[in-house]
Amino acid sequence: MELAVKTLAGDAAGNIDLDDAIFGIDEIRGDILQRTVRWQLARRQAGTHKAKSRSEVNRTTKKSIKQKGSGGARHGSRNAPIFVGGGIAHGPRVRSHAHDLPKKIRKMALAHALSSKAKDSSIMVIDTCELDSPKTKGLIQAFKDLGIENALIISGTEVNENFARAARNIPNIDVLPVAGLNVYDILRRRTLVITKEAAEGIKARFDGAKAEAE
């Protein structure tokens, strides 16, 4: 797949060939993307939710009413879940929400996410993401000229500090290095913007995963 390369100023900077095995998949597997997004979001959950059970509520355990003669039901401890202020039955506990997902599926999902952007013509290649100064105003104008409004920008191995500082105040713009590229962030933004260095890094990342699998 061949795409035109532009500069941040909007000028032409040649063309680049993207690997069809990564960016040119025809049949996008929505089920694989859904599984991977669920896996990512589950890993992000803190899992610190907690409700006290009847054994953890700090109340007296003295029998609340006498066994017989009250005309009501028999009751013992006020810690029981049926009482106001009692423990919670089957309430949330501190736990990890993470679950396993094979590396093969994660690699496949990343390729399908990248291909989905290419298939929708929602991918853009720029030559570099480097700025001389961290000026947000100038970057906003550059994005406007390029038609970038809601985008994930993959800058390369490292993120230029001035570019990162200028971009972090712009809504709906995310900037990540190649190592941070993930399915969820690709899908949540309308456009995927990569640099030439990032394109090489993505190819190397997939080649490394392939070599590891072998």
UniProtKB/Swiss-Prot annotation:
Q: Where is this region: Disordered?
A: 43-83
Alphabetized UniProt keyword annotations: Ribonucleoprotein, Ribosomal protein, RNA-binding, rRNA-binding
Q: Which Pfam families match?
A: Ribosomal_L4
Per the record, the GO terms for biological process are: translation
GO terms assigned for molecular function: rRNA binding; structural constituent of ribosome
For this record, the Gene Ontology CC terms, alphabetical, are: ribonucleoprotein complex; ribosome
Stored InterPro entries: Ribosomal_uL4 (IPR002136), Ribosomal_uL4-like (IPR013005), Ribosomal_uL4_dom_sf (IPR023574)
Q: Which cysteines are joined by disulfide bonds?
A: none
Query: Whom does it interact with, and what assembly results?
Result: Part of the 50S ribosomal subunit.
| Record family assignment | Belongs to the universal ribosomal protein uL4 family.
Under PANTHER family, the record lists:
50S RIBOSOMAL PROTEIN L4, LARGE RIBOSOMAL SUBUNIT PROTEIN UL4M
Give the protein's biological function.
One of the primary rRNA binding proteins, this protein initially binds near the 5'-end of the 23S rRNA. It is important during the early stages of 50S assembly. It makes multiple contacts with different domains of the 23S rRNA in the assembled 50S subunit and ribosome.
Name of the protein described by the UniProt record:
Large ribosomal subunit protein uL4
